[in-house]
Design a protein with these regions (language model features):
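Short, charged/polar micro-motifs that form catalytic or ligand-binding hotspots
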Residues: 1-2, 47, 68, 72
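Short terminal alpha-helical segments
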Residues: 1-33
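Extended, non-membrane alpha-helical segments enriched in charged/polar residues
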Residues: 10, 14-17, 21, 59-66, ...
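Short, charged, amphipathic alpha-helical segments
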Residues: 29-35, 76-80
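Extracellular/periplasmic head regions of type IV pilus-like filament subunits
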Residues: 40-45
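Amphipathic alpha-helical binding modules
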Residues: 61-90
């Protein structure tokens, strides 16, 4: 599969705009810790994951805020942190 980044950006904007139109200015996440499946296991549906790890939403958000405020350089792994937050919101 190949995804156009402009289309991906647009669909994220549409979804976040919809939340704002529903009156949300913030979202509350009551859970903090989650199971993290290693990438090599995540997309292997015919085998059970071997080494689960713990992820933390507050940690992910802190790393993203560092990117937002310029104290950390953008890196592709930021999308992993973002995905954990979007999953929790959804």
């Amino acid at each position: 599969m190949e995804i156009d980044l402009a289309e991906l950006r647009r669909v994220v904007e549409i979804l976040l705009n919809d939340l704002e139109q529903q009156g949300y200015r913030t979202v509350r996440l009551d859970d903090d810790y989650y199971w993290e499946i290693p990438k090599e296991d995540l997309y292997s549906p015919y085998a059970a994951p071997k080494d689960l790890a713990m992820g933390q939403l507050t940690h992910d958000w802190e790393r993203l805020q560092e990117i937002l405020h310029g104290s950390s350089s953008p890196l592709a792994y930021g999308l992993v942190w973002l995905s954990s937050l979007l999953r929790a919101i959804g």
